[in-house]
């Protein structure tokens, strides 16, 4: 079980934490941003996207690049399907997690695994636009002409043991997530970029089925 948790953390975590973000300035009207972000998120029922993940391990000089497909559907359903350079599948469906690595399959309940519960909540909050309401983080918001950057610094004990910071970049046109970045305590650095996004696309429930 511990090995599976570490594998998922490696797949969806990373970034280097910076006191400032080049090209960004603090949002002057945070209340307005919260309102617009929440309103746009309410209209987003589903997301279909490709993704590119780049992971920099502190012990290696070269980055590891992975590609795959991503689906999100309210409420609380996420599917990440890695197809290059390896095959890997992760499904988050409410309080259940399914992981398939080659021929190995694992089903985990977030109710019985606090670490997976935290990972699950982070992913869902990012997609549903509720990250600013998560009391487990201290939040700051920055912006440039085209995007807004939400910085999440963990204050809850469990999360502080996993991450230094998480940043979520959203497109100002529709407030959809364009990238998620995280910094592990180990210094490993990862960014997941979402491309070819389709909002409110037809996403079958069967994609999130955990048998």
Locate predicted features:
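Flexible, surface-exposed loop/linker segments and immediately adjacent secondary-structure boundaries
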Residues: 108-147
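Short hydrophobic/aromatic-rich beta-strand segments that constitute the beta-sheet cores
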Residues: 51, 78-82, 97-100, 150-152, ...
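N-terminal leader/targeting segments and the immediate start of mature chains
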Residues: 18-52, 56-61, 206-211
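Sec-dependent N-terminal signal peptides
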Residues: 4-13
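Gly/Pro-enriched, hydrophobic low-complexity segments
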Residues: 21, 132-211
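N-terminal, post-signal-peptide region of Sec/Tat-exported proteins
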Residues: 47-78, 83
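Short beta-strands and strand-coil junctions in structured, solvent-facing domains, enriched
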Residues: 58-59, 79, 86-89, 106, ...
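An acidic-aromatic
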Residues: 69-117
């Amino acid at each position: 079980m511990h090995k599976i948790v570490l594998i998922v953390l490696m797949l969806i975590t990373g970034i280097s934490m910076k006191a400032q973000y080049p090209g960004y300035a603090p949002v002057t009207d945070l209340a307005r941003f919260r309102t617009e972000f929440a309103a746009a998120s309410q209209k987003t029922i589903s997301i279909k996207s490709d993704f590119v993940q780049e992971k920099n391990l502190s012990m290696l000089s070269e980055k590891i690049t992975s590609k795959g497909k991503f689906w999100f559907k309210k409420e609380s359903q996420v599917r990440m399907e890695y197809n290059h350079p390896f095959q890997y599948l992760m499904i988050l469906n409410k309080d259940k997690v399914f992981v398939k690595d080659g021929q190995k399959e694992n089903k985990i309940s977030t109710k019985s695994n606090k670490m997976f519960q935290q990972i699950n909540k982070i992913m869902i909050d990012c997609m549903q636009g509720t990250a600013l309401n998560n009391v487990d983080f201290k939040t700051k918001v920055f912006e440039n002409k085209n995007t807004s950057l939400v910085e999440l610094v963990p204050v809850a004990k469990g999360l502080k043991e996993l991450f230094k910071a998480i940043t979520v970049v959203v497109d100002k046109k529709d407030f959809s997530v364009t990238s998620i970045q995280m910094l592990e305590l180990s210094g490993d650095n990862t960014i997941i970029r979402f491309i070819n996004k389709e909002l409110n696309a037809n996403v079958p429930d069967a994609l999130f089925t955990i048998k």
